[in-house]
Amino acid sequence: MASPLENLENHLEMFIENVRQIRIIVSDFQPQGQNVLNQKIQSLVTGLQEIDKLKNQVDVNVPLEVFDYIDQGRNPQLYTKDCIDKALTKNEEVKGKIDSYRKFKSNLMKELDETFPTEIAKYKAIRGDE
């Protein structure tokens, strides 16, 4: 038996196919095709009702930005790529800050060791840095 997500995906694919077929019928509409169009529209409504029933079985959170990408005609998969790129950039910034703090600590300890050797020796002994 298909998982709820797979079931929803199948219904969405059928819905999209149904919309595509309706578009074809409407783009070259002939009066004798009215019954077929009515059937397709009814099947579209039924498909939406089925999708509505399935929505409670699937818990998927889609960031609103993904819909912005779609509205702009961009590939929604680019959202993931952009998020990864932003995370890498932020990671590099944080790594730079960490490295700066380590250098600062090292220089501070060196200066303090020269200025207050006894106190720094006690500090290092307490911390176990010897």
UniProtKB/Swiss-Prot annotation:
Record's keyword terms, sorted: Activator, Nucleus, Transcription, Transcription regulation
UniProt cross-references to Pfam families, sorted A to Z: Med10 (PF09748)
GO biological process, one term: regulation of transcription by RNA polymerase II
Subcellular localization: Nucleus
GO molecular function terms listed in the Swiss-Prot or TrEMBL record: transcription coregulator activity
Keyword Metal-binding: no
GO cellular component, one term: mediator complex
The UniProt record lists the keyword Nucleus: yes
PANTHER family the record matches: MEDIATOR OF RNA POLYMERASE II TRANSCRIPTION SUBUNIT 10
Family: Belongs to the Mediator complex subunit 10 family.
Function: Component of the Mediator complex, a coactivator involved in the regulated transcription of nearly all RNA polymerase II-dependent genes. Mediator functions as a bridge to convey information from gene-specific regulatory proteins to the basal RNA polymerase II transcription machinery. Mediator is recruited to promoters by direct interactions with regulatory proteins and serves as a scaffold for the assembly of a functional preinitiation complex with RNA polymerase II and the general transcription factors.
Quaternary assembly: Component of the Mediator complex.
Name of the molecule in the record: Mediator of RNA polymerase II transcription subunit 10
Organism expressing this protein natively: Aedes aegypti
Gene: MED10
